[in-house]
Amino acid sequence: MKALVIGAGGVGSAIANIASRRPFITSMVIADRSLSRAQAAVTKVNDPRFSAQEVDASDVNDIRALIRKAAPDIVVNAVDPRFVMPIFLACEEEKVNYMDMAMSLSTPHPTDPMNKPGVKLGDEQFARADTWSKNGNYAVVGMGIEPGMSDVFARYAEDELFSRIDYLAVMDGSNLTVDGYDFAPSFSIWTTIEECLNPPLIFEEGRGWYTTEPFSKLETYDFPDGIGPVECVNVEHEEVVLIPMKVKAKEVRFKYGLGAQFIETLKTIHTLGLDKKEKISVQGVEVSPRDLLAALLPDPATLGDKMHGKTCAGTLVKGLGKDGNPKAVYIYNVVDNEWSMKNYGNQAVVWQTAINPLIAMELIANGTWKPAGINGPEWFPAQPFLDLISEYGSSWHIREEEPKGIVK
């Protein structure tokens, strides 16, 4: 498979590192607005299958030109969600296959944003499904860790473990710390703000999708593998859009284990207006407060050797098991930063994200997954994906939970 990866930040660089160990990749172009950053990712893998290019991910025509030059089987979007639509549209126009790890951005409801959704995550992409089907190409959207592996867990739960799903919550948490920083997100601050400060999206059977105030439904969840209890809140996330489209569940939500200090910091950022995307004039210079904040914080790709701890992504499912009795499980994946740095030179959060598009690409390349049109991870059988996780050096587990309050 010939791949073009757009974005040479933490996730894009990790994709290159992992892909260099997989023979199904015949060639991979790593492209970035900074040619030197793309070249650094290629130099690190030291593999003749890999090359670097420069591209402006906000410019559809520039992306189209690179697609024509690289002639890939698939384009992998490894930049933040602002650039989903330019890359997606460039692939549509060039009739080339596409994969991303985050979907097109949402827009709040114009008059009632804390109760009703406006434009949901991914709506812009799914609105073009007929065109993709007509073109004979595929787009696999939301194929990172969350969304991505978490959606695969949801599909597995329905197929193998449950006869009825009452409650499904993707639960993300970690005990990661960064030396020398009180506040240093391990992922793009632009994306973190977008997820955490937008009204959270929730799905309920019979009601459909609705929204709440940011940071709603605070609960402390005890994460596995020594991570322990972390304060979790509702957050807007793609799984809440994708999972109800293919998995029958009475309730779906995403809860992010941010921790009390992180939550308070984000609230302060919002209070000060530093989360705003729109540019303002500062002494004659036009600048976006969110872009300024991102420039002030450390690049997550550079934090690996300063990070300690583990990160966990998983799906909590409650309902009736295949035997008709109450059942609750947490299906999860944990990555230790010490392990990912030692074996790949990538910090845990970006490595955990990067393996998933590659597993999906391998399943497509060998004909196990057969995407057509626009697809999410839960469109496909889960077991082949889960079987490949161990080949990529990671693992997945099922923890039985107390099935409290589940009525037959």
Predicted regions and their residues:
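C-terminal catalytic/substrate-binding lobe primarily of soluble NAD(P)-dependent oxidoreductases
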Residues: 159-408
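Conserved Rossmann-fold cofactor-binding substructure of NAD(P)-dependent oxidoreductases
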Residues: 56-72, 79, 83-86
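Conserved N-terminal Rossmann-fold NAD(P)-binding element of oxidoreductases
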Residues: 3-9
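N-terminal Rossmann-like NAD(P) cofactor-binding module of classical short-chain dehydrogenase/reductase
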Residues: 67, 73-77, 91, 98-100
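Rossmann-fold NAD(P)-binding glycine/threonine-rich loop
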Residues: 101-137
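Helix N-cap at the beta1-alpha1 junction of Rossmann-like dinucleotide-binding domains, i.e.
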Residues: 33-37
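Rossmann-fold cofactor-recognition segment
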Residues: 45-59
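N-terminal Rossmann-fold NAD(P) dinucleotide-binding loop
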Residues: 12-13
